[in-house]
Amino acid sequence: MSQRLPSLLLTFVCAAGAQPTFYLPEHLRGGEFAAQHPSLVPPPHLAGPKPSFIDVPVDHFNGGTATWKLKYWTTTSAEWSAAKPGPIFIEMPGEGAAGGPPSVRKGSLIDHFNGVGVGLEHRFFGTSIPLNSSTTKALDAYLSVQQNLADIVFLLAHIKDAMKLPANHPVVSLGGSYSGASAAWIRMLYPSQITAAIALSPPIRATLDFRAYDESNAAALASPAPSCRDQTVATMRALDAAIAADEIKTMALFNASHLHATPMGLTDFLYGIADAAASPVQYGQKAVLCSALAAALPAHPTQDEYVEFYANWTLKQYGGAYFHGCFYNSDCMRDAEHAYPAESARSWYHFKCSELGYLQTATPTPSSPERDGVNPSVRPSSLTVATLIAQCNYIFKRETHGVNATQLLGAAIDKFNHKFGGADSSAGLFATASKIGFFDYSDDPWRTASVLKTTRASLPVHLAVCDGCGHCGSGATPSIAKEVAQIQVQLLTAWLKTT
């Protein structure tokens, strides 16, 4: 372990393994990829504590009396007592259905600090739909990062009151990915209510053109040897050519013929193709793609051989219904205003299309391909800001009336980053923030939207470096997972002492 000042970047090195702290989204669980990596899939649902509900304002900021029932769970560690209560640990809600109370297993932070765990379901995800409406009008009015954070502060006040805890009782926010960014944002926005935060793989910087996601995937696939990246690039260029020559035939190879007849079907198809290659990298299992490329392709593949290989591999890894869910179907999301569970996909796209961006575009071919630092794209080349903005407008039935939709989203993203600071610890609310631990992993393509360095000891940035260290620790060995946990304990021990 080495500490590099002034960036306060702690780096630990390990070999790749499989100790994830993050589960695959539902649309990636239909094939061999999930079956062969069971630790990436949540365990079967077991009967557990029933959730509680609290009436929460639909709109925390613009008045009105409307409320909705927020679903939440609480659980206490074995050693917790009213005489000596440990801190509250709030597990920030993510962009999907909540599964139940936080874990208090031995070794967890809640267990270590004899704390209370609180979990909840994010508004407009799962079955938590305020006003029972996911229309564009409802989402525009009531789905935002700040409405979610206000829900949590409201809930925490209720829990403290119910447990007879003082208003200043310490609270730690925890999360990974979007919920990791939320853990940091809530500490910034409500420092008097949130004592400290632990944020894993947090895309804290909203961004319009997130081509860095593509560049990071290409870099990860080039290690330990460039052959995997080069073959993936060749596969994507073969797919570009095949789609241009015969879109219907190419879609049929992926069991996606139904998308051809829809207005956004090609964009949906391209995004699914891109995700199929990106997901093994993101979840710490890039060898699944690299080994298949090495084993299945001849020495000098033709365009048809690349395309046929990738179609067969995609359906094998993610199942024959990969393109038949809502996540890669803009028509499904467009019509999902009253249709659980498709509403969750619609809600996440609304976040992307209205406030956070994260539009995962293909890296344009540089004018000088040999230029240092440029990785060729491992996504279909037609995934551009323009095509993804058009998809946003279609899903949410937005008429631009001559207004530049790209500029509108860019302005919303700039406003968001101006408030919270993006990844710049000297800007916005970030400038006065403290007691936030940022944890990232070297192969995670979301890392470029996280905090790469800070100049304050109260905002430590930790990077786990290994060939295969993916999102939220997926692909990291038990030893590196243990080391990360130890650092978190050290940080919280120090920070909670000062409250």
Task: Please report, for each region that a protein language model flagged, where it lies by residue.
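Alpha/beta-hydrolase active-site loop
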Residues: 140-162
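Alpha/beta-hydrolase fold nucleophile elbow
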Residues: 165-176
